[in-house]
């Protein structure tokens, strides 16, 4: 069974360029990368960034383009999506993965924001999710639209938060769906950990 939000699985995000960014010396064992300058400007000596630092990094990089910078809660979601060791931080390689994902989602948002208002409506959200490979019931899409829209419009920041949460929950579900049947059975405590970690 193919899962949305994974490269090669029909959706979720698209590989993208990394854009221009100042380079810099790498942490030991890492080669220089164009994104390193943004990352190193906010990372501590441990080579990790938390949600506050990620917010500063993304704001300084201008990845949001003409849209409002990401709020702290969206940055927390981004960190949790890639926080495989549950440290509450991300390293440079995770940051590069996030950068590629964000660029893909940003391009996707732009393609559905046809009036260039900086928002999409619930119908456009449904189309966007479908083209990313998410096969959701109308009831699920309605719940998502209610959660992420304000006055019937979904901002870029909320769109990204929605994409992050869908990917993180899909990843969590996928790890438990070992038979790839689209159905899982797991303990309540495990469910709470899955949902509360994103």
Swiss-Prot record:
Detected in cardiac myocytes. InterPro entries: EF-hand-dom_pair (IPR011992), EF_Hand_1_Ca_BS (IPR018247), EF_hand_dom (IPR002048). GO terms for biological process: calcium ion transport; negative regulation of cardiac muscle contraction; negative regulation of heart rate; positive regulation of release of sequestered calcium ion into cytosol; regulation of calcium ion transport; regulation of cardiac muscle cell contraction; regulation of cell communication by electrical coupling; regulation of cell communication by electrical coupling involved in cardiac conduction. It holds the Pfam family EF-hand_7. Ca(2+) 1 binds at residues 83, 85, 87, 89, 94. It is found in: Cytoplasm; Sarcoplasmic reticulum membrane. GO terms for molecular function: calcium channel regulator activity; calcium ion binding; DNA-binding transcription factor binding; identical protein binding; protease binding; protein heterodimerization activity; protein sequestering activity; signaling receptor binding. Ca(2+) 2 binds at residues 113, 115, 117, 119, 124. Residues 29-64, 70-103, 100-135, 134-169 form the EF-hand domain. Transmembrane segments: none annotated. GO terms for cellular component: cytoplasm; cytosol; endoplasmic reticulum membrane; extracellular exosome; membrane; nucleoplasm; sarcoplasmic reticulum; sarcoplasmic reticulum membrane. Changing residue 112 to L: Reduces affinity for calcium 5-fold. Keywords: Calcium, Cytoplasm, Membrane, Metal-binding, Repeat, Sarcoplasmic reticulum. This protein is encoded by an amplified gene in multidrug-resistant cells. Calcium-binding protein that modulates excitation-contraction coupling in the heart. Contributes to calcium homeostasis in the heart sarcoplasmic reticulum. Modulates the activity of RYR2 calcium channels. Homodimer. Interacts with GCA, RYR2 and ANXA7. This is Sorcin.
């Amino acid at each position: 069974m193919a899962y949305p939000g994974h490269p090669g699985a029909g959706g979720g995000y698209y590989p993208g360029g990394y854009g221009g960014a100042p380079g810099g010396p790498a942490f030991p064992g890492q080669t220089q990368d164009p994104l390193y300058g943004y990352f190193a400007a906010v990372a501590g000596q441990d080579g990790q960034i938390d949600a506050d630092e990620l917010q500063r990094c993304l704001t300084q990089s201008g990845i949001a383009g003409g849209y409002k910078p990401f709020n702290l809660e969206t940055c927390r979601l981004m960190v949790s999506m890639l926080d495989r060791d549950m440290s509450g931080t991300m390293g440079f390689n995770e940051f590069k993965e996030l950068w590629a994902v964000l660029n893909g989602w940003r391009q996707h948002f732009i393609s559905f924001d046809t009036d260039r208002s900086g928002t999409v409506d619930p119908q456009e959200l449904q189309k966007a999710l479908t083209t990313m490979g998410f096969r959701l019931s109308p009831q699920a899409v309605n719940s998502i639209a209610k959660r992420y829209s304000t006055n019937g419009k979904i901002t870029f920041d909320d769109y990204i938060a929605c994409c992050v949460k869908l990917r993180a929950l899909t990843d969590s579900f996928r790890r438990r769906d070992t038979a790839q049947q689209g159905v899982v059975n797991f303990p309540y405590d495990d469910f709470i950990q899955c949902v509360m970690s994103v």
